[in-house]
């Protein structure tokens, strides 16, 4: 998905953009906290322990906002969050924002103790839910809807969060401003260019992504809801300093 996009944008911006993928969400967050990446496509940058690295938002995808959900199978006897107390509930990973951090915050606010089970990624935990290995799961609502439709099963949404803007593209402060601007503009302009939209469409087809394609210019202010969440969360390990 990413390599053709980075190749196109890099040539437009006059820089080489190389893809680096961490083995897990946790490793990605750790690398971001160290400032390992010049550019990053992740919402980990809003976690308090990562925010100190100073990443600055440049772009947002044109996708619809994302929500966190707690779901169960449609034929499950569980119809209320309180019924999850004491049960194993699945999550993608401990670093997944709408898949874990937001749902577990809600459960703890309601003083509902569950036993977290991690599936490694979104589809991993969704597969466990489908197989009946867990009674419920914390998920990205948009991804859950697509997965359930593709796999042919129905879910019941027990709870859904407010909407958050989808993943941003951000830049580390060590990157020269001129380079950051060139990369931002190259990515933002792709959808309006004949060759650029062709690259975006071809990449999207590889993963079944639906339009609209590409990126729009954005700033930190567009993602203030993340900062608001981390200031108010009851999860001490994720709470931002006042």
Regions inferred by a protein language model and the residue ranges of each:
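Extracytoplasmic small-molecule ligand-binding "clamshell" domains
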Residues: 1-45
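An extracytoplasmic/periplasmic, membrane-proximal ligand-sensing/linker region
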Residues: 1-4, 171-242
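Ligand-binding cleft/hinge of the Venus flytrap
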Residues: 3-16, 59, 98-118, 145-152, ...
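Short helices/loops that flank or line small-molecule/ion binding pockets
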Residues: 26-40, 52-53, 82, 123-138, ...
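Short loop/helix-cap segments at secondary-structure boundaries that form the rim of catalytic
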Residues: 32, 48-52, 147-150
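Hydrophobic/proline-rich hinge and linker segments of small-molecule sensing/allosteric domains
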Residues: 57-80, 168-172
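Pocket-lining segment of extracytoplasmic ligand-binding domains
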Residues: 76-77, 85-185
């Amino acid at each position: 998905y990413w390599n053709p996009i980075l190749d196109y944008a890099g040539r437009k911006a006059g820089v080489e953009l190389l893809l680096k993928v961490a083995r897990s969400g946790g490793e990605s967050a750790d690398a971001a906290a160290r400032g390992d990446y010049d550019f990053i496509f992740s919402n980990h940058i809003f976690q308090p322990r990562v925010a100190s690295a100073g990443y600055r938002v440049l772009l947002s995808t044109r996708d619809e906002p994302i929500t966190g959900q707690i779901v169960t199978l449609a034929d499950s006897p569980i119809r209320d969050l309180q019924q999850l107390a004491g049960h194993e509930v699945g999550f993608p990973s401990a670093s997944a924002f709408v898949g874990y951090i937001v749902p577990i915050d809600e459960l703890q606010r309601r003083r509902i103790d569950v036993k977290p089970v991690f599936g490694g990624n979104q589809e991993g935990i969704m597969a466990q839910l489908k197989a009946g290995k867990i009674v419920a799961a914390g998920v990205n609502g948009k991804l859950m809807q697509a997965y359930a439709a593709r796999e042919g099963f129905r879910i019941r949404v027990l709870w859904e969060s407010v909407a958050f803007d989808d993943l941003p593209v951000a830049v580390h402060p060590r990157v020269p401003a001129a380079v950051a601007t060139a990369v931002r503009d190259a990515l933002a302009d792709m959808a309006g260019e004949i060759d650029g939209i062709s690259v975006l469409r071809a990449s999207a087809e590889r993963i079944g992504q639906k339009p609209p394609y590409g990126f729009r210019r954005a700033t930190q202010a567009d993602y203030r809801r993340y900062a608001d969440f981390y200031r108010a969360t009851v999860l001490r390990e994720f709470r931002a300093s006042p």
